[in-house]
Amino acid sequence: MSNIQNHQKVVLVGDGAVGSSYAFAMAEEGIAEEFVIVDVVKVRTVGDALDLEDATPFTAPKNIYSGEYSDCKDADLVVITAGAPQKPGETRLDLVNKNLNILSTILKPVVDSGFDGIFLVAANPVDILTYATWKFSGFPKEKVIGSGISLDTARLRVALGKKFNVSPESVDAYILGEHGDSEFAAYSSATIGTKPLLEIAKEEGVSTDELAEIEDSVRNKAYEIINKKGATFYGVGTALMRISKAILRDENAVLPVGAYMDGEYGLNDIYIGTPAVINGQGLNRVIEAPLSDDEKKKMTDSATTLKKVLTDGLNALAEKQDK
C-alpha cells in the first residue's frame, strides 16, 4: 500500500489464460494504479506487462510490471489464478491434488513477504483452493474470497435473459453451491423486475423441464467451451475484475462468490458459493438465500461433496509433505 492517497496495488499470481484475461480486464477498467504479474514463467509476465502497458493511454494511467512474491508486501489485493488447467474430460475436482500442491508453494512466499491485504482465489477447484488458502495463510476468513459461483451465476443470467427476452443484467438469479458439478440454480428466489421467475415461467409456458435444461446447460457450459477452444478465460477474468472492483472501491456490492460458512445454510467450516456483501475489508457478510426444501438438500449435498474431496486432498498433501 503506497503512501500516495488512493494508490492501490494488485498482485496477480498466475499468468496463464485466466490470469492474463483478468489483467486485461483490470487495465480496460482502469482499476488499481499498480499491477504486478508473477508467474514461474518469468518471460511471459514481462511480455504481458509490456503488452498491457500499451493499453494504458486509451484507459487510465497504470504501472504494470513483472514482479516477484516480495512485491506482495504492500499490495492491497493478491489474486491467485495459478494452477494446472482443466483438460477435456476432466472435472474441476480431478484437479485437486495437482493444484493443492501448487498452491502450497505459492502461499508461503506471499505471506512471508508481509502481505496483509485480501486474497481472491480463482484456481480450480476453487472452493477447495479457497479453503486451503484460508487454512494455509492463517488469514481471517473475511480476507479470503473465492470466485466461487460468480461465473456460473453469470451464465445462468445469460441463459435466462435469452429465454425470457430480457437483459441478463435485469435477471436476479443465482447459482449456489460448488463451482462444479453439484452446483444448482436457486430458482425459488429468482426474480425478473421483482416478479418471481417461477411465476413468469408459468405465465409464459416455460416448463420446469425447460428450466432444468437451462440449469444443466449452465452446469456443463465450461465443458462445452473447453471442448471447443481448450479453456475458459474471458468470462472468469471479467468476473474477477468485478469482485476486485468491489474490494478496491469499497462498494458493499452484493456479488456471487465463494465464502466461508459459519452456520449459514446449516453449514460450517467450508467455502461454498453464495451471495455476499463485498467491500474494502473483503467479505463483509454472507447473504443467506431463501431456499426451497429441495434446494436446501442440494446445498447440503454440494457441501458434502466438497468436504469429502477437501479432506482427501488435504490428507494426500500432508502425506506427500511428510515423505
Curated annotation (Swiss-Prot):
* Superkingdom of origin: Bacteria
Which EC number(s) are documented for this chain? 1.1.1.27
What enzyme category does the UniProt record give? oxidoreductase
Report the pathway entry.
Fermentation; pyruvate fermentation to lactate; (S)-lactate from pyruvate: step 1/1
Q: Which residues form the signal peptide?
A: none
A GO BP term, please?
Answer: lactate metabolic process
- Which of this chain's residues are annotated to bind substrate? 86, 92, 124-127, 152-155, 232
One Pfam family from the record: Ldh_1_N
Q: Which UniProt keywords apply?
A: Cytoplasm, NAD, Oxidoreductase, Phosphoprotein
Q: Which CDD domains match?
A: HicDH_like
Q: Name one GO molecular function term.
A: L-lactate dehydrogenase activity
Q: Which GO terms describe its cellular component?
A: cytoplasm
Catalysed reaction per UniProt?
(S)-lactate + NAD(+) = pyruvate + NADH + H(+)
PTM Phosphotyrosine: list the residues: 223
| InterPro entries to which the protein is assigned, alphabetical | L-lactate/malate_DH, L-lactate_DH, L-lactate_DH_AS, Lactate/malate_DH_C, Lactate/malate_DH_N, Lactate_DH/Glyco_Ohase_4_C, NAD(P)-bd_dom_sf
Q: Does the keyword Thylakoid apply?
A: no
Where do the catalytic residues lie? 179
UniProt binding sites for NAD(+): 18, 39, 44, 69, 83-84, 105, 122-124, 147
Give the UniProt subcellular location, in the record's own words: Cytoplasm
The record's listing under HAMAP family reads: Lactate_dehydrog
How is the quaternary structure described? Answer: Homotetramer.
The record describes the protein's role as: Catalyzes the conversion of lactate to pyruvate.
Q: Which family does it belong to?
A: Belongs to the LDH/MDH superfamily. LDH family.
- The name under which this protein is listed is L-lactate dehydrogenase
Which organism is this entry from? Pediococcus acidilactici
